Amino acid sequence: MTSTTSTVARIALEPRTIDAGGIETSYLEAGAGEPVVMLHGSGPGVSAIANWQNNIGTLAQRFRVLAPDIVGFGATERPDDVTYSLRAWTDHIWAFIDAHGIGKTAIVGNSLGGRIALQMATDCPDRIAKMVLMGAPGVGMTLTEGLAALRAYEPSHDAMRDLLRSYFAVDPAMITDELVAIRYEASIADGAYEAYRAMFLDPRHAGSELGITEDEVRAIATPTLLVHGREDKVVPVQVSVTMLGLLPNADLHVFSACGHWTQIERADEFSALVADYLARR
């Protein structure tokens, strides 16, 4: 039976801040044990809380979970001198991990967060214990209709609702008024829209920068769980199928009747799947 609602009670999550490489970084933290860093995707109004509020409670029962707002997103500082790029985002997450004194960690990355995780595994493979990549861009990624719609967003409550319901979930009922409000308010926070436009002013350039070659992927030996929604309109499931054939230590789980947001559309199953994978020795 397809799960369409989360039965796991949310835990109280109060944002914290830490200096990460000179950037005042907002993040969520819960639990104890081996560290798991959760990286949200891109898009207008994205943040750690909007991305992971249905999952942190389950994972925090077994791990120390940290979920930052990546520079340019959420409540994290937006320095005037930052040029948003894969390198800048990756360096910010390394600084965040270092600021917490963490040597080695697992990474759970959604969409853009998954691409950052791949770069981290390339940079310092000995510091990444495992990866979970959800709807992440990879080899063969092209500019889809969903990505184009994301980058064309102009702030309004109706535009945010229509964007999320049209491209992110198979069942529009999964896009709650609460989620729309969280995303919309974040998209009009001071400097948020300007930062988002700066990231994706030229979608062709942004897309090419996030690309990765087959040889680069084959060189990543980190144990990896690929998770994808079969009906994903933002990053097609075929991207993960291709990555499965290239990553030497990868498994793939595809959720049927599911779009780009596996962690929201199939929250309970996703959280249990990820927790079990990360706990496996």
Question: What residues fall within each predicted segment?
Answer:
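Conserved alpha/beta-hydrolase catalytic His-Asp/Glu region
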Residues: 155-218
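Conserved HGGG/HGGXW glycine-rich cap/lid loop of the alpha/beta-hydrolase fold
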Residues: 23-75
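Short beta-strand/loop motif that positions the catalytic acidic residue
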Residues: 220, 226-228
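Acidic catalytic loop of the alpha/beta-hydrolase fold
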Residues: 231-235
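Catalytic active-site module of serine/aspartate enzymes centered on a nucleophile-bearing elbow/loop
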Residues: 250-281
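Gly/Ala-rich beta-loop-alpha elbow adjacent to hydrolase catalytic centers
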Residues: 109, 113, 117
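Flexible "cap/lid" loop of the alpha/beta hydrolase fold
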Residues: 118-122, 129-162
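Active-site loop/oxyanion-hole signature of alpha/beta-hydrolase fold enzymes
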Residues: 28, 57, 67-108, 272
